[in-house]
Each structure stands twice: as structure tokens, then as C-alpha cells.
Amino acid sequence: MDVKRSFLFLQGPHGPFFRKLGEELSRRGALVTRVNLCGGDFLDWPSHSCNYRGRTSDWSEWIGDLMAKKEVTDLLVYGDWRPHHREAVHIARLHGIRVWAFDEGYLRPDWITMEEGGVNGNSTLPNDPESVRSECQDCTCEPGAIQTENPLFKRQLKAWWYGFFSFVGLPFFPFYRTHRPYSHCAELFSGWIPHFFTAKKRMASSEKALRRIGDTPYFLFPLQLDSDSQVRRYSPFSGMKEAIAYIMTSFAQHAPQDTLLVIRNHPLDNGLIRYDRFIRSFSRACGIEERTVFVESGNGREMIRKARAVVLLNSTMGLQALEMGKSVYCVGKAIYAMPGLAENGAQDSLAHFWKSPLAPDAKLLRDFEKVVRCRTLINGNFYFGEGMKLAVQGCADKLLK
């Protein structure tokens, strides 16, 4: 007799996506349990859920008991590296429970990532050309995606509301501490709110900086969120300022004198770190103030198109750059860093890359993206309209397959 599937949801992307996916799985006959850890979680899934208000030191035993009581067969988490998630994942694996990790799409736009076992640094995707080509031969998925609307402002709004409710919910979840390096209170009142009111000025400054570049050849360095696990767990750096210092120093020492370094901020940055001030100060110390350009915004694809090459930690912008035929160097651990695609320290030094960047192998890239789509991607988005509905249906189909 088939065992009835029992899905346990922990924290998901900001907004109702996990709740809607749970409702769809329940409609199809599965058992669904959700655990809220903070006020933001409660906002996203207020009913038919349970709240954990205990200490972090008691979490492992509590979640293990819940898994046994609910006879959980599948654990769903957004990001497998958060402390609460990490402990739950270990317990789930011990008891043979499937782990499904979600994240923004490895390929964008119009895709989300849902990978069994783990994502990013914990991914089991093939990481050498021979394995990629071998697995690609068995892939039968369709290459196209239905385009969906996914406005950046709506994503920011969901993040703001999540942070606000996490802050006001502290009396009800007194022991919860965010996995992020800053509290929700600090992010909201010292970051997002002043960041919002200076947006117009910052955009004007960015437009002026982009005009200054003109036809000068440049290397593009797209920043990632300072709180991103890709930065803090899967790179040699403790945060983005350390990464910026490393890359700027290398650029000053080894890049051709006729090139610029264009540093683009992440569009969802909360504004707590004044990157403009730090980069201005550090560029002066390195003697490259006139060769360094920092922008808060700008069309990412257009900036990639005009760049000589792209240097980054492990952002998915690296895959976009490879798709556009650009050379990419990863300073951190990335799923696409392998011979023939993006370079990294295992293949060559950053010092050499500034002078002689290697173009990607287009056929290998097509094979790799096909494997990624077949193994990990669902068409749609986490946040808005028809794209969310599409992703919910696709995830439910795959989970119950």
C-alpha cells in the first residue's frame, strides 16, 4: 500500500507562495503541516499552521518530534542553510525524509529553483564537463518557458512587510533571531526606510556614473546581498565589503590600465551598508578612484553586454553573462564554475583573468542549462500573479510525481 505523502513546510520566500503550494498539495490529497518561526512567517501563513515559540536550543528535539508525529515524508525549505532549516534537514535525512530546497531560479527570469537534497553549494548538479554532457543525453524536458510578470517593487514590498511583521511579532516569538546578520528592526528603520527616501537621488547619481563610462572598456562586478549564504557560506569572504576589497585590490594590481571596474549594487540591497562611501574610500587608497565606477541601478543585461568580462562571487548573473558569450570569473563556489564555462581559482588566477579572459564553450553551456532545467527548475515565480500560479502547479506536479 502506498504511504500517504506528508509535507512539512518551514520558512519560504516572502509572500504567500508556500501557503498556496500547501493548499494545492492538500487539495490533491496530501497531508500538509506548516511551522511559523516569527511574525513574518505568520503573516504569510496565518491559519492551519503551528507556531514555534521556544528557544533555539530546544528546536531540534521539537521539530524531530513533530516529524515523527506527522509521519513526514517530505521537508520543504527556502534556503537549506538557515540555522533552523539546517538542523531540520539533518534530522530529516537521518529518518529518510526527502528534502526539497527552494531558491530563486538558477536561470532567470521566469524560473524558480526546487532541488531535491539542497541548492547552490549543496547542489548535486554535475560540476565537470564530462558529467554535464553525459547527463544531458538523458534530459527530455522542453527548453522554453512561459514569460511571467514579476515586478521588482512588489518583491521589495513583500520583504518590507515581512520585516515589519517580524518586528512587531517579537512579543509572540520572543526567542526568534533572524538568520540574517542584522535584526529586522535595524533593516527596516536604518535600512529600507531611509533607502526608500534617497532612491531618487541615488538613481540620478547612477545615471550620471553610467554616462561617464562612455565607450571605455570595463569589467563588471555585480554585488550580491551581504546577507546571502552564497557570500557567507560559499565564498572565502565574511561579507561583501571584504569581497569588494579583494577584487578592487586585484584590479588595481593586474588589470590593464585602460580599463574601468564598474561595481553594480544588488537591486534588493537594504541600504544598511554605504557601499558608495566604502568604495570611494578604498579606491582612493588603491589609487584607482578614476578607474572605479559604482552604480546603484542600471539595466543588468545591458551592462553585461557592454562589459569586457564579468567578475563576481557566485551570483546567477554569471549564468546570464555566459549566455551572452561573456567571460566570467567566480571568486566563490558556483554551480557553473567549471572548465569551459566560468573560470575560478581551481583553473586560473584572477590576476591572469584580468589580462586574458577565456570565452565560454557555447555547446557546453547549452548542455549545462538543459540539465539545470530538467533537474531543478520550475517555470513561474514566487511572488506575483499568473507566474505564482504557474509555479505552484509545477511544484505540486513534481512533488507528487
Language model segments and positions:
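Catalytic core of nucleotide-activated saccharide and alditol-phosphate transferases
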Residues: 100-199
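Conserved catalytic-core segment of nucleotide-activated headgroup transferases in glycan assembly
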Residues: 28, 173-278
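Leloir-type glycosyltransferase catalytic cores
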Residues: 126-170, 340-401
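A short helix->loop->beta-strand "cap" motif at the edges of active sites that frequently abuts
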Residues: 94-99, 259, 325-326
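A donor-sugar binding/catalytic signature common to diverse glycosyltransferases
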Residues: 75-77, 84-86, 296-342
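N-terminal subdomain of nucleotide-sugar transferases
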Residues: 1-38
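Active-site and donor-binding regions of nucleotide-sugar-utilizing enzymes
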Residues: 14-20, 37-132
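Donor nucleotide-activated moiety binding/catalytic core segment of transferases
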Residues: 55-69, 267, 272-316, 323
